[in-house]
Amino acid sequence: DNDGDLDLFFANGHLNSVSGDNRQSNLLFKNDGTGLYTDVSKSSGILDTGQRIHRSAMFADYDNDGRIDLFVTVNGQQVEDGKGNTIYDENQGKGILFQNQTETKNNWVKIRLEGTKSNRDAYGASVSVLVNGIKQKQFLVSGQGYFSNHAQELYFGLGTSIVIDNIEVKWPNGLRQSFEGVQPNQTLLFVEGKANYHKIK
C-alpha cells in the first residue's frame, strides 16, 4: 500500500510426506506502523487461490504501476501409497501471480543499481531512503527464495511525502553516494561513481 511500513507475506506448503495432504493456504499480514500486524489474507484475496504446496514468493512491480505485485511458485501435490508409487494432481504445480489492486494515493520510488568497480549487478549494496525524518534501508541480494529471486531493484513506499529528503547508496566496495531532494513516483538508475542518477520512468 506504499505507506512505508513493510507488510508480511507467507508462502505456505508442507514438505512432501508419505501420506496426508501437504497443501496449505498463503497468509498476508498488514503492518499498522506500530509493530502490530493484522491478518488480511481473506480481504486481500490471497485465499481465493485455495490450498496448494507453495514454495516461494517473488516481489516485483510486474505491470509498472507503482504497486508491488507478487508471484508464488507451487509444487505439484504428491501422494504416495507407501509402496513406491507416486501420484501428482494435475494443474497443481502452476505458479500464481497476484496483481496488486490496492487503492492508494501514497507515493513510491524504485531504485536500480549498476556497479562499475563493484560487481555489475551491485549485489551486496544497500540503499537508505530518508523521508520526513524516517529512514528505510534495504539490501540488494541474490537468491531470496526457493529457486527464485525478487526483481533486481529496490522498492520503497513513501506514504504521502512529496519529496525524498535523501537517498544514500552504499556500494559493495564501501563507496557511499548521497542524493538530496529526489522526486517520488519514478524508477531511478544509480551507476556506481556517477554524480547523477538516471530516470527510467
Q: Predicted regions: what is each one?
A:
Residues 1-2, 54-64, 73:
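Beta-propeller blade termini
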Residues 9-13, 71-73:
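Residue-level marker for isolated small/hydroxyl-bearing positions within beta-strands
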Residues 14-17, 77-79:
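Short glycine/acidic-enriched loop and turn motifs that connect beta-strands
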Residues 24, 53-55, 93:
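Beta-rich catalytic cores
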Residues 25-32, 95-99:
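Beta-propeller blade signature
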Residues 35-47:
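Blade-edge beta-strand/turn elements of extracellular beta-propeller
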Residues 44, 67-201:
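Gly/Ser/Thr/Pro-enriched helix-cap/hinge segments flanking short amphipathic alpha-helices
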